């Protein structure tokens, strides 16, 4: 349920941009989400459809791009893709066997691209 306030903020950012650009509508939005955010993508999509109703983003296509978690091994300093879930869950560094990591990337959450349709002048 923590997705709803996040989606509201994302929509606000997009609407502010569209207003500044004098857009008639928002056609698509690409959202980059680091895997460490632990957002449920189905809820992000569902809530976006809900909160965008009645706005110029109501017909926008929401593109969700997942970004991997990149960590540095605290022992050997190698960079690895860290997996949080499933059979590939990372517990040890594949290079040295180290068990402690520093996260470098994977916590991101940002609007990467907004495609708008501009208003025609004078109409």
Which residues fall in each region the model found?
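Long, charged N-terminal interaction/targeting segments
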Residues: 1-65
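Charged phosphate-binding loop/patch that engages nucleotide di/tri-phosphates or the phosphate backbone
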Residues: 113
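Compositionally biased, charge-rich low-complexity tracts
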Residues: 118-123
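Short cysteine-rich clusters marking metal-coordination/redox-active sites
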Residues: 73-76, 93-96
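Short, flexible, mixed-charge glycine/proline-rich loop motifs
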Residues: 61-69, 82-87
